Amino acid sequence: LDHIRPKLKLRYGDLSDSAGLSNYIHEIVRENQGFTILEIYNLAAQSHVKISFEIPEYTADIDGIGTMRLLEIIRTLDPGIRNKVRFYQAGTSEMYGKVLETPQNETTPFNPISPYAAAKLYAYYMTKIYREGYGLYTTNGILFNHESPRRGANFLTMKVINGIKSIISGKKVWIELGNIDSKRDWGHAKDYVEGMWLMLQQDKPDDYVLATGKTYTVREFIERAFAFKGYKIHWEGEGLKEVGVDQNDIIRVTINAKYYRPCEVDLLLGDASKAEKELGWKREFDTLDKLIEDMFS
């Protein structure tokens, strides 16, 4: 981010601190007198699903109540300012949980099965309530999994990418993972950030799904990522004893129960046709292989 750092004005913030958030938003308003539109993107969250089972109260406070704090600050701004504010809330496909229909779109019923998803669902509905009840310009982006080279090291896709890099460099022999049979709809964060921005450029606010419309198992992601670096992975054994073995009969993937979630989301597959039609949203990274290639960069 060095190329844009001189243009940024960074502040410490905490979604559990209403006073601090209010001071920051009012400071932005004072420093930008005469602005036409003020766009606020709420991307802050405790976003690790498995960890949300370990710290459910914190997850609810930050991901759920934290969003309400922002909305309430916006609601109490002077009307002349409030009407210029546009608010984006980062929703998640995890809200669909044990899916009730496939593919999932804006009308699919939610069925969350993690503290993270439940907190995000509260934020989703509060965003709608403040839009419909107070006339605020608020929108929910229901984003399916989106990755990039900046993905956190404790997330599945980056664990695989970094693990392969470590295998190549000789720092480790295999990668240890959890459930490899769950299915996900993976896209690139660059495309999805473009979609977020497009949502706040519309005359009227609404909610939109961003997804690729393709789903792959974690197993397939592993195979394709290894293949990109010249490894051909096949599988031996079952359950916790299953291993991924390369073309030289060296074990490269093992399974550990500690990485399983208490409740597993088995299948996520999004339908972004509304965003494509109404926002003109298009994806640059249109295949899983292009995504993997960029994650190795």
What label would you give each PLM region?
Residues 96-98, 149-151, 217-219:
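A short beta-to-alpha transition loop/helix N-cap that caps and shapes the active-site region
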Residues 1-146, 190, 200, 267, ...:
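N-terminal Rossmann-like NAD(P)+-binding domain of SDR-like oxidoreductases, especially those catalyzing
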Residues 13-16, 69, 153-297:
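C-terminal substrate-binding subdomain of Rossmann-fold SDR/epimerase-dehydratase oxidoreductases
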